[in-house]
Amino acid sequence: MNSKQSQKNTLILLILLWISAISIFPYFLTNYIFSQDDLLFHRTRLDRYYQTVKHLDFFPRVFPTMGLNFGYGADLFYPSILLLPFAFFRIIGISFVPSYYLYQFLISFITAATSYYFLYAIKNKKKQALLFSCFYTLATYRLIDQSVRAALGETLAFAFLPLFILGVYTIFYTNQHRWKLLSVSMSLLIASHLITAFYSFILLIIFILLNWKKCKQAQIKSLIQSGALTIGLSAWFLFPYLEQTYHLTFNFANTTLWATGLNFSLSNLISNSLANVSAPFTELKPNIGLFLLVVVIIACFNYQKLTTNNKKITLATLCLILLATNIFPWAFFKVSVLATIQFPWRLLLFSSFFASLLATGLIEQFQLLSSRQVLMFIAISSFLTISFNVNNLMQSNSQNSITVTNKNYSDFYESEIGHGKEYLIKDTDFKKYFASPSPIIDGVSSSDSLNQADNKYNYSSYTLQTNGTQEVQLPKFYYKGYEVKDGQKVLSNYNKAGLVTVKLDNGIHNITVSYKKTVIQTVSLLFSTLLAGLLILQFLMKKKK
């Protein structure tokens, strides 16, 4: 690599770092995080995962102290492994708030890098790749996810969507079918945000149906290989998930579309985008932002002049925008598998991707790619981002929104387990249990002085006195995989009203409860780990050749 090329790459890296920093400016200058929408749930996930990593448990399945020590299966249904960088920041001594912003910066940088790689891999043009990276990483809907909704999983999904689409692109439009990339990216989407992974799969099916003529034997083979590899790489999550849902019915099985999504209109989207603000979550205004809205309008007015590719991208963007609003009859699917999206405006994630791609395509077609013009577009995006962030910070301040700080993060709303309590067994009366977090003996909450509890990281112990044979519901939310002991004797346990339940004979009992995980969890994790290791080894050996 010559000196000039090295300087260009260094400049690109610096710009990507700039984009990443701007995405969280000026939030990272504060010593607090505004508590909005999903923040309290993710605050708890982040802190509990940090605790499990300290005990070298990277796949905890159940966070034993989450939910007032009742133990919550967040990791069973919402994977935590990608939170590892945050845990590392905490372990090396960085406090909660700066660790949170460092983690957000890292996510933004990965998003900027993967989106740059996406377009560079297709076009082999650095300026276009840099512009797309800027538009996509600083897309307003991504900023809403990141800093207004605190939707950590969906923010992570933004980072891997470009790799997923690149994998699909290579299978259908090139001779080099990168089906392994498609598998890895889908596995990362699953590990990030299951809803986004599910809708990525739905959109892939729609794409295949629309492009069936391109689906020859080679494409079908690559898709099947990719699907099989995805199942293998994600077995550590998918099979334990299916195991739990086969035996138990959870609250998320009854998901319906929320009114805030069903009432979201196209006029709402346009006016919100023009305003360049989203407001705190109580007055959330989902949108794609002023810049991308202008891009879509320009593309529509100049549609006949556009290149074939830009016409296709325009149509894809418009379709996704309309799907995100109530122009599409979402009410028909209010109680269906499609209702897992909760809010149809979540599709603005995909709209933002294609609108950013459209913006880059228009700039290329209209030949606005001089170095000065490229820097001008980056400056415009940066300015709008700062404006958006500052406006939202100001509104949160003016409404005296609750804040999470380094002092209160661990004891602030300790019982928080998410808005919908999705990962509790259906009809679990968590409010009753939280009000009296003690064993329930034959349906009566125990208050006997002999009944004592001791909660450690990997087990909880209870000293109980029973009169005759009695049924005892322990203060632990039930998931398959618990082990209950009376002294050294392992007891059979089962679910009753959402709690781990056992039957005890007459006398005083020393009960210990620990989540030992299931055979399926252990074997599937081992399989996925070995498969991932083989893929990495194959990649490294290929690099050496």
Where are these regions (language model features)?
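Generic signature of intrinsically disordered, low-complexity segments enriched in small/polar residues
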Residues: 2, 52, 81, 89, ...
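Compositionally biased, intrinsically disordered low-complexity regions enriched in proline and serine
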Residues: 19, 28, 33, 64-67, ...
